[in-house]
Amino acid sequence: MSDEDHDFAHQGGGDNASKTYPMAAGALKKGGYVCINGRPCKVIDLSVSKTGKHGHAKVSIVATDIFTGNRLEDQAPSTHNVEVPFVKTFTYSVLDIQPNEDPSLPSHLSLMDDEGESREDLDMPPDAALATQIKEQFDSGKEVLVVVVSAMGTEQVLQTKNAAEK
């Protein structure tokens, strides 16, 4: 069976060439990352089928999109490469929350890293509960730390931390 017999959305490089690197499907680990349908995902379950009469063992991958939380599944021969995203996490202090002129859009965040560098290009997270938690902590006068995850050209606030956890 050739690769053309499969619809591997995670093959090739395309626009994500420098945002991913290849790894043998059989080398993936639970808790690691993989691209499925062009989306960066965290692996939550892996299973390997036995080698069949046509050669390769198959790896079944169950993962969640790191930005949306959607569950995705894929399969690949264990010896074939899949794309793995470069995932980076950063912790920032929230300096200010500026409401958007359009109330239907998320508020903008003013953030500062440990070196004192500021940035104002991120919005409140789409997760309403997390956005509310950030706003309530900020409004109460507490120092608010947010964890920003960056992968495949997307950056998003995914959680808050206590200042003591820094």
From Swiss-Prot:
Q: Where in the cell is it found?
A: Cytoplasm
Q: Which UniProt keywords apply?
A: Cytoplasm, Elongation factor, Hypusine, Initiation factor, Protein biosynthesis, RNA-binding
Q: Does the keyword Protease apply?
A: no
- Name one molecular function that GO assigns to this entry: translation elongation factor activity
Q: Report the CDD domains cross-referenced here.
A: S1_eIF5A
Cite the record's Acidic residues compositional bias ranges: 112-122
Question: PROSITE patterns given for it?
Answer: IF5A_HYPUSINE
Single GO biological process annotation from the record = positive regulation of translational elongation
Modification after translation, per record: Lys-53 undergoes hypusination, a unique post-translational modification that consists in the addition of a butylamino group from spermidine to lysine side chain, leading to the formation of the unusual amino acid hypusine. eIF-5As are the only known proteins to undergo this modification, which is essential for their function.
Stored NCBIfam families: eIF_5A
Record PANTHER family? TRANSLATION INITIATION FACTOR 5A FAMILY MEMBER
The name this protein goes by in its record: Eukaryotic translation initiation factor 5A
